[in-house]
Amino acid sequence: MEERVLSSFENEKYRIRVFYEEFADSPNGVYDMVGVMLFTYDNGKLHEECDWRTLLGKHSDYNITMKEALKELVWKYVPHDKMIKFLKKGTEHYQLKWNKTKRRWQFWYDERVFGSNPCVLFSSDSEDMHCGYLDSDMLSKLEKSDIVELINKYGKDIVVTSLTTYGYCQGDIQEMFAYCTKERFNEMVETPKNNWKKKATEFMQNELKECGCWMWGSVYRVKVEEKVYFTKRYANGEEHEDFEYEDCECGQTFYCEDYDEALEWVKKDYIKE
């Protein structure tokens, strides 16, 4: 069965056609990206095709939520005292307050989001405020946006960004995240390293967009063929000019929202106005 042509362009020299690429790999698995890509299945667990191995280690279990993945970044890159400082200051969603009467810290939620009752986290005589305790009782209560704010504000040599992508059916939505360390940026990018967080974020936003296109099936293969001209000569002496197509590029893959966008990218390389 012949493939369906989604879009095409033809002139005296080339024929360019765009097809769906049904079996494309995730772009983060195809080529090196500046960011470490994190996205999930419909059940909220990390997707097998995201870069969970970079975050957790190749022998780890990737069956965790996005919030748990972001918390891993907190423990790796945010100093403990900065964590407490951030929690004390609070955000629009919560605030950590000291209850003088009960002599313990209490986690106060915005009742419009969490309900009116405070959640007791740890008492003043609990000197062993180790990471596991804080992980279960504190960071789990935060919104993902709060955790990202914490990392970007106090994380050492790391930047995190996110992008919300939408599918083609009602309710198709995916909030995808990416992070990059200063060390990784220096290895991946040859441009000047000043203001590296801003530059890394710009790279990662584009990379997340490509991963989102893959997630929703917006992947296209562009085939370029050159017209090779020749002359047919018949026994009766007649001549007829004809041509045949010769492959130039048979499988250039594009992760983009519209197939015409893929066509225009290739036309820039082959068609001179």
Where are these regions (language model features)?
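Acidic interaction surfaces
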Residues: 1-273
